[in-house]
């Protein structure tokens, strides 16, 4: 399994710096193979399961990096300087995923009730094209309450581009942001 973890990625141009597969993926492959070979043993197609001698890697827990409260103001100031404060403020107070954030339309905002309807997300399909889909799980389709300050920022943002259906159109193209662009912007803001 070491080779899979170091060199197992088929498409190394997908933006991952590591050409290998994660321990979670390798473990999933092991479990799938083990189950298939176990079935073959039960059906007497093979005499023993070749994966019995293999040790699947332990799943490595990745520590989430979070923004510390004392850095919040400087983060928001940097987002404001880049002209993207409403988007990143909403992300902070709502916990929306990047694909959900860029898929938001003005119709998703209920100003009176201070809620945002989350019912879609943009994701990259295997060929690299963006596609609109429902969120990961049915419980991910939801209404998110947001503070009045977020609503006020969103209204100000809408006044800048009232003809756009997108809540956060790109200042360059006028179209929606790509989810990866949001990540890159976030990284730039952290460096500012």
Give residue spans per PLM region.
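Generic structural detector for well-ordered beta-strands
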Residues: 117, 143-145
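Basic/aromatic-enriched alpha-helical hairpins
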Residues: 1-19, 36-38, 42, 191
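Short, basic/aromatic-rich helical patch in the C-terminal catalytic core of site-specific tyrosine
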Residues: 33-37, 95, 101, 186-187
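Active-site/catalytic core of tyrosine-dependent DNA strand-transfer enzymes
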Residues: 70, 113, 121-127, 147-192
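Basic, Lys/Arg- and aromatic-enriched nucleic-acid-binding interface segment
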Residues: 10-14, 18-23, 27-29, 42, ...
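A Lys/Arg-rich helix-loop hairpin that forms a DNA/phosphate-binding surface
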Residues: 1-6, 50, 174-175
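Short, flexible, glycine-rich and Lys/Arg-enriched loop motifs at helix boundaries
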Residues: 120-139
